[in-house]
Amino acid sequence: MIKKLVSCIREYKLPTILTLIFIVGEVFLEVLIPFNTADLVNAIKAGVSMSAVVKTGGLLVLMAMLSLCCGGAAGYFAAKASAGFAKNLRHDIFSRVQAFSFENIDRFSSASLVTRMTTDVVNTQMAFMMVIRIAVRAPLMFLFAIVMGFVMGGPLAATFLFIVPVLLFGLILIGRKALPAFRAVFRKYDKMNESIEENVRAMRVVKGFSREEYEKAKFGKASDNICRDFTKAERIVALNSPLMQLCLYFNMVFVLYIGSKLIVSSGGQIIDVGQISAMLTYGFMILMSLMMISMIYVMLTMSAESMKRIYEVLCEEPALVNPAEPVTEVKDGSVDFSGVSFKYSKEAKKYALAGIDLHIDSGMTVGILGGTGSSKSTLVQLIPRLYDVTEGSVKVGGVDVRDYDLEILRSAVSVVLQKNLLFSGTIKENLRWGNENASDEEIVQACKLAQADEFVRSFPDGYDSRIEQGGTNVSGGQKQRLCIARALLKKPKILILDDSTSAVDTKTDALIREGFRAYIPETTKIIIAQRIASVQDADMIVVLDNGRLSAVGKHQQLLASNSSYREVYEQQTRGGEEHE
């Protein structure tokens, strides 16, 4: 995992290395300062000339300034390296998600992916910053201070052998108690993000049912849970500071007590005042470095959850990949399902589709009907290879879809999914998702074919009118027609409408189908519908029942041979007549 994440440093290796170099310089200079301070204290005590004091003091000031410069440079390069590392992480996660198939996406919720690209990346960025700054600084300071303490202090350094283990034990205990609470916080972040995303997406439904108070209470509960767990963890971690202060004061007392006794008993031969002063500073450095190591341990363990979640995305292999020698041309819009069975995961016991054998000639109009859960959408999603079949094969233009270059195949197949989505931007910008090089004339023609031109021109800015995120400022029927126009701009060999005229009135629906027959006769048109009227003029109607083919034929044939089809048709026709 660490190796994978470290690979995201890439072009920011130099700032990372420079950070480490400057930190080593900063720590080295800081550790030398108490050594020279001891000389200054002894010089003042001995009453040497002022020039010697100024010389030693000047050296201390120079060392402090150099240490400051090294610290500033380390901070600058660390900030640059960590920001670049986070940028690369976000880029790699987003790029990986773009390569995912529907099968991959099904394993992660959208709220979880958002959390991984935001909160988790920030946590990992902070961990990286701590590693290249504090995780290097703290052990170095601990090591240098211990060495200098034993070099200078002699017997006084023995106090470290007592204080250090006590502090270390306390810090480890605090860390182990805090970590479970931090882990619980990150698990609950996803739930809160899901609540936020759900509420924002369904804001109109929430207001329509006057559920604002319920949603506020639900969000408040999720937020309170995070606050409670975070407070619990922070309360435990807060014990670090008083423990550190306690050990520091004990160390000061021991050093001063033992040092003063040694000075009195030896007449300053074993140790002097300057050395005691230095030992107090080194003791502070040692204890501070241990506290920093403890904080790093807690923070890194907290971040480990975020790192793990990022690693899961980065190491998720796309379920669909291009073959070694892909076919780069789709000959026509014919489709063949041969012994097709499909289930959404290998572990699933039940097949969503089973034993599908179906041939569709290029240029045909095919209607697909079936009850809720009959896997109509699943069937058509196999054509552009949004999923791979579990058994059997799907061929487009006489070639197995698994042999095509994915981009080539999907450019030949336009799918208007059941859940229509428009992006923030102008109507033109949205439509050019179908063909970024489409001319204004082609855009207008596609909209006329989709019966969208009239209402688009009624907007104040026409085709330059802005669409809000998700298309919230247009009606459901308008959104569907714009999505159909966008799909038509691809000039596909196969056009799939997955219940994409459900929000359109029957007259407009009929006009759209008439336009298809007149202007794109060579395109294979596959229409999933709830209304038989939307597909009764199709060249072939496919009826699905629980993922299996129930009947195939033309409208009149099915009326005569299939009782279920006839019953649904009569109900819909009778319902329409009663409504009229």
Which positions does each model-derived feature cover?
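Alpha-helical transmembrane segments of multi-pass membrane proteins
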Residues: 15-16, 63-82, 133-140, 161-188, ...
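Transmembrane helix-loop-helix hairpins at lipid-water interfaces of multipass membrane proteins
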Residues: 10, 16-73, 77, 150-155, ...
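An intracellular "coupling" helix at the cytosolic face of ABC transporter transmembrane type-1 domains
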Residues: 11-13, 99-103, 119-132, 136, ...
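Hydrophobic alpha-helical transmembrane segments of ABC transporter permease domains
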Residues: 10, 21, 25, 33, ...
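Juxtamembrane helix-loop junctions of ABC transporter transmembrane domains
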Residues: 21-22, 29-42, 63-110, 114, ...
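Short intracellular "coupling" helices and adjacent cytoplasmic loop segments at the cytosolic face
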Residues: 46-48, 83, 91-115, 119-121, ...
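Helix-loop-helix
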Residues: 48-49, 53, 58, 148-162, ...
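ABC-type nucleotide-binding domain
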Residues: 329-580
